[in-house]
């Protein structure tokens, strides 16, 4: 089968290359992939690793075994940008017929990251919450979940002077100057949850920035530490989508063969919402 393989030493991000068909382990499902999500972290890994096969967010149909023919969505260990992929069974859930594969493929990493961030933020009823990277795959969902939790939400690309003082929670993914500004905007006893650095710029933390804002916490978040929650999180998110309370914004949908164009668009910040590869149509 033809799968996406990274080529950081070449002129483009990746190439389609013939690879062996995957063989599922006893605790895995073999899935015929219909749609696969693209995450910004995968761009970083593709620049670092030769012959890397990205793709964790997949939605499709179980291709073998007792569950053959079942529509599922899940979080793979990689190798998802391909016609077939294996996924740990404990990180997959059935996909309701009324939710399409494209929508579902936006949830296993981006959606679950947003949900985990909101849960780590504590009780948000009446609290001031700022979400950075608010037009991205994680941000679009985090903004909606924070509002569902009763927060007063400020949605921005990065924290700057336009953000009001007294933010109880800041979900920070821009890094650099944005994180510097977050230190000046957070409330007494507030929380800054750092889950990315899309600017690739260093941040300066000056103790004096905390003057008048005692007990502020700056906490890191890495999605890999929460993968065991994927199935429960996916069930929650799918329920919200089915009820119409959560809208998944697809900013780019392209065939697998055009993966380099999709990666260029995401890298150049030309995608609002989630970028999705359509595998079945390739």
Label every PLM stretch briefly.
Residues 105-164:
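Mid-domain Rossmann-like dinucleotide-binding core that forms the NAD(H)/NADP(H) cofactor-binding site
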Residues 73, 170-171, 193:
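N-terminal Rossmann-like NAD(P) cofactor-binding module of classical short-chain dehydrogenase/reductase
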Residues 177-245, 279-282:
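Glycine-rich phosphate-binding loop and adjacent beta-alpha segment
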Residues 1, 229-282:
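C-terminal hydrophobic helical "lid"/dimerization subdomain
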